């Protein structure tokens, strides 16, 4: 039996590897065949380009190979003798496991995709748990103004979650006109270009004069955080959801944070609880469950976020397009359905 997987062999060199695979299972393991697999462009391109701060536990610069990918949907092919939660034919989320065609996973590492949620939607579940965390940590109150800065996959999901949480108005900003239009279609009340000369004044005007009470910062750039500090309301909260990997500018902490009572909240997914959820801090699996409920009910829409589906056989070309194109696709799925 063979398994195929995506590998970053070196900086800016992505390849598809095929090698032997042993499908035999331990009693608590599940054999899963991948169906669809979402590329997390921010994280994966940071690793592809060998940027700093790609690992919260240390500096990985210059260290290859790397195994990208962590948001997969698949179906159960067989189960070990002690498995009780899954059976052959079940559709499942496979988190933190790379872009690959086959998996052997302990049953407590998987999550069931219910009927009414497609495999393409299910492939978004793990990545969607990141903006769930970023929005939950803000603990948005009904009627609070919210800004989502940066409209990649995470930001466009965060726009919908901020709206569902009772934020009003919900503002969104991004350089891309196409993404601003999509944010409006998905529920944003206003969408702005942060390069506009009167951007700060517009944001404040649209939120009653003071600025938004809560900001989901997903640009990944320190300049985006600086801008948020200039338009946020006094006593406001900023959730750092995007990974700001390069600290390339000073911030006047006294003027923009200390003196105005601003809360800066780290919202990296590694900061969530492992076992029990509590207000503002939910486990991954509880966020997966909420994602499934909202998608199934039609109140969270991730279908418009996927605008390209490709074969893993196109791995080198896909990462070159994502890494170097001036207008890269928003959401890219690997389609593993024709791999044996």
Where in this protein do the model-derived segments appear?
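Short N-terminal strand-loop motif that marks the start
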Residues: 1-64, 68, 335-340
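A generic structural signal for residues embedded in beta-strands
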Residues: 32, 94-95, 148
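A structural motif shared across PLP-dependent enzymes of the aminotransferase-like
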Residues: 41, 95-107
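Mid-domain Rossmann-like dinucleotide-binding core that forms the NAD(H)/NADP(H) cofactor-binding site
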Residues: 118-197, 201
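Glycine-rich phosphate-binding loop and adjacent beta-alpha segment
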Residues: 223-293, 297, 336-340
């Amino acid at each position: 039996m063979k398994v195929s997987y995506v590998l970053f062999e070196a900086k800016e060199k992505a390849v598809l590897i095929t090698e032997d695979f042993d499908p035999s299972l331990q009693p608590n393991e599940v054999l899963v065949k991948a169906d669809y697999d979402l590329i997390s462009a921010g994280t994966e391109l940071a690793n592809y380009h060998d940027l700093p701060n790609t690992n919260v536990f240390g500096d990985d610069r210059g260290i290859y190979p790397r195994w990208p990918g962590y948001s997969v949907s698949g179906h159960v092919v067989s189960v070990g003798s002690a498995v009780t939660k899954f059976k052959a034919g079940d559709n499942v989320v496979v988190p933190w496991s790379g872009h690959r065609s086959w998996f052997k996973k302990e049953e407590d590492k998987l999550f069931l995709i219910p009927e009414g949620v497609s495999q393409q939607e299910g492939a978004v579940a793990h990545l969607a748990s990141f903006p769930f965390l970023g929005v939950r940590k803000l603990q948005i109150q009904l009627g609070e103004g919210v800004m989502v800065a940066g409209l990649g996959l995470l930001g466009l999901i965060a726009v919908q979650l901020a709206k569902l949480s009772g934020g009003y108005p919900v503002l969104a900003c991004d350089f891309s006109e196409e993404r601003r239009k999509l944010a409006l279609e998905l529920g944003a009340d206003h969408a702005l270009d942060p390069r506009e000369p009167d951007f700060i004044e517009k944001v404040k005007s649209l939120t009653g004069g003071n600025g938004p009470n809560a900001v989901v910062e997903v640009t990944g750039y320190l300049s985006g955080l600086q801008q948020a500090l200039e338009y946020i309301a006094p006593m406001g909260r900023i959730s750092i959801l995007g990974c700001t990997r390069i600290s390339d500018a000073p911030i006047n902490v006294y003027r923009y944070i200390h003196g105005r009572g601003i809360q800066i909240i780290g919202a990296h997914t590694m900061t969530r609880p492992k076992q029990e959820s509590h207000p503002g801090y939910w486990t991954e699996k509880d966020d997966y469950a909420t994602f499934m409920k909202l998608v199934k009910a039609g109140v969270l829409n991730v279908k418009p976020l996927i605008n390209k589906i490709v074969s893993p056989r196109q791995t080198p070309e896909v990462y070159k397009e994502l890494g170097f194109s001036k207008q890269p696709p928003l959401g890219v799925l690997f389609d593993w359905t024709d791999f044996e």
